[in-house]
């Protein structure tokens, strides 16, 4: 089996798709968070021309047990055939559909410093299901500045823009002190999902899906694991 290496961040998580059958099953967040990883590896297999794979071989690639993989997928109906395994293309498509990636989403980025610029570039180049329709910054922006098809504007027009354009997702990369105000603004305007890349947790209504990406948390955990390795 080929060795697959990738640096793609597991970011494609849409927790509030409005699918009542999935909610009724009360599928754990841990399962949902593993699905993008499955999909990412399946995409690499598909690129290499692999047509089918067993849960055992998939476990070697991903690092989860074969039993865990089967259990996770069985939450959604299985998809495998005994004696055959999984169709790589079909499983990749089905997991994408479960995550909501059979649809497209309008997105705004709020905060256009270095992190906001990096995320705009990453999303536009790697995430075809997410269309950046507007970019906002707390500082005064020179008029008529654009990033590809998205105009770069000041936060004063954020609420009206989100409401008018029926934006689905807001990516927040503003300074931490302004994060809650920005979140409240976009929620009031109808946003249903927030990708929070600031250093603070947001206080939001329960019907708003939020994914907090605190980079320092990951870095600090890395340092712990480095020390743990040294003691072995």
Model-derived regions, located:
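Hydrophobic/small residue at the entry helix of a nucleotide-binding pocket
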Residues: 115
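Intrinsically disordered, Lys/Arg-rich N-terminal extensions and targeting peptides
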Residues: 1-16
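Extreme N-terminal segment that seeds HTH/winged-HTH DNA-binding domains in transcriptional regulators
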Residues: 12-51
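Glycine-rich Rossmann-fold phosphate-binding loop(s) that bind the pyrophosphate
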Residues: 112
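NAD(P)-binding Rossmann-fold cofactor-contacting core
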Residues: 126-148
């Amino acid at each position: 089996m080929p060795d697959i290496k990738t640096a793609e961040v597991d970011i494609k998580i849409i927790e509030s798709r409005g699918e009542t059958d999935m909610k009724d099953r009360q599928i754990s967040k841990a399962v949902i968070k593993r699905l993008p990883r499955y999909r990412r590896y399946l995409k690499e297999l598909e690129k290499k021309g692999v047509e089918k794979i067993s849960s055992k071989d998939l476990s070697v690639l991903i690092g989860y047990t074969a039993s865990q993989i089967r259990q996770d997928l069985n939450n959604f109906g299985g998809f495998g055939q005994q004696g055959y395994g999984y169709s790589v293309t079909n499983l990749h498509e089905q997991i994408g559909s479960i995550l909501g990636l059979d649809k497209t989403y309008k997105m705004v980025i709020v905060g256009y410093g270095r992190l906001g610029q990096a995320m705009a570039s990453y999303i536009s180049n790697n995430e075809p299901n997410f269309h950046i329709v507007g970019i906002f910054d707390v500082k005064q922006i020179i008029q008529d500045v654009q990033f590809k098809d998205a105009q770069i504007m000041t936060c004063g027009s954020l609420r009206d823009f989100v409401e008018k354009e029926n934006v689905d997702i807001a990516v927040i990369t503003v300074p931490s002190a302004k994060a809650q105000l920005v979140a409240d603004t976009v929620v009031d305007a109808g946003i249903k999902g927030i990708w929070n890349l600031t250093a603070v947790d947001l206080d939001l209504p329960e019907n708003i899906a939020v994914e907090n990406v605190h980079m320092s948390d990951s870095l600090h955990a890395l340092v712990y694991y480095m020390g743990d390795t040294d003691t072995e």
